[in-house]
């Protein structure tokens, strides 16, 4: 399993974000509000979704894989593509997959849109402290996609605080990364917010009686330099994706592809949800409330 620990220079990132933070309370005033959703085109045949991101899209668990399995369990046809490179921002993900990306972006579909949905996840350093670059990267990639998918619905991935919930500045950086994601949504046509950060924050704060500590260990995220979603977090994210895109609660499969652990010899494989997830119902409710 690919578990290279990604070094973001996190101290410098947080220091920069701290210096650029506003003191306004407006950052978190819309935390509990339901965000507007983009309008997806009417697809002929199976719709197609593209995931663009780095290790928060796929590391210990895979958002594209879990979303595909949840769609299948709900008899929801879906073709899934992904452009994923660990530890880099959107423009570098594009550069890393340029040939594949250009080939796919040039494809057409009989309904007029090759892609129906696109999920865009920016790197934590950029999403947290470089709003201008964040907006420019999203504009660059959406402009390319819209050439043959003019009506595609875009979802901006709201990142998580890079700090542990126990850190005194966790909430400050949660607010900052959320504020920037909302700013990107506001400048991106036909886009909405995929509220991963909000959902994870709710789970940490015990919504629906969820308890993130299991045997005194964080059951949502794990990492040394970067905190990545574990099975509980991946389950939450998968349910959130379905609820956000289709505006309904998913029927969750009894088995999902989840991680066997966090060691170098661990991997992803199909597992019993009842055994691998600490509180599925609570996580499903948290996901639905953040759609």
Placement of each model-derived feature along the sequence:
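Sec-dependent signal peptide recognition
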Residues: 2-8
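C-terminal motif of bacterial Sec signal peptides marking the signal peptidase cleavage site
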Residues: 14-17
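Bacterial signal peptide processing site
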Residues: 19-21
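N-terminal low-complexity, Pro/Thr/Ser-rich intrinsically disordered segments
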Residues: 26-48
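Conserved SGNH/GDSL esterase-like catalytic core that processes O-acyl groups on lipids
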Residues: 48, 52, 58-136
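Short hydrophobic segments within beta-strands
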Residues: 52-53, 157
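Alpha-helical cap/lid subdomain in secreted, periplasmic
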Residues: 106-231, 243
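Conserved catalytic region of serine esterases and O-acyltransferases that act on ester linkages
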Residues: 220-228, 232-291
């Amino acid at each position: 399993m690919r578990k290279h620990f990604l070094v973001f220079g996190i101290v410098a990132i947080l220091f920069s974000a701290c210096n650029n933070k506003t003191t306004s309370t407006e950052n978190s005033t819309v935390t509990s509000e339901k965000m507007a959703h983009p309008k997806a085109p009417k697809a002929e045949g199976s719709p197609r979704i593209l995931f663009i991101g780095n290790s928060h899209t796929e590391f210990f668990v895979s958002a594209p894989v879990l979303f595909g399995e949840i769609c299948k369990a709900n008899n929801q046809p879906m073709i899934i593509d992904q452009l994923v490179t660990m530890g880099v921002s959107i423009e570098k993900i594009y550069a890393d997959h340029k040939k594949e990306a250009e080939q796919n972006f040039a494809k057409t579909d009989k309904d007029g849109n090759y892609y129906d949905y696109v999920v865009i996840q920016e790197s934590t350093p950029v999403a947290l402290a470089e709003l201008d670059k964040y907006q420019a990267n999203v504009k660059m990639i959406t402009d390319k996609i819209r050439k043959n998918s003019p009506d595609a619905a875009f979802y901006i991935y709201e990142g998580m605080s890079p700090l542990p919930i126990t850190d005194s500045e966790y909430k400050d950086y949660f607010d900052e990364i959320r504020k920037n994601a909302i700013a990107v949504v506001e400048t991106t046509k036909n886009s909405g917010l995929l509220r991963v950060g909000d959902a994870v924050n709710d789970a940490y704060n015990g919504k629906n009686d969820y308890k993130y500590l299991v045997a005194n260990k964080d059951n949502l995220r794990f990492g040394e330099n970067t905190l990545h979603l574990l099975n509980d977090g991946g389950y939450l994210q998968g349910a959130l994706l379905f609820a956000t895109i289709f505006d309904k609660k998913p029927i969750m499969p009894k088995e999902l592809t989840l991680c066997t652990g966090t060691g170098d010899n661990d991997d992803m494989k199909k597992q019993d949800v009842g055994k691998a997830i600490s509180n599925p119902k609570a996580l499903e409710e948290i996901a639905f409330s953040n759609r």
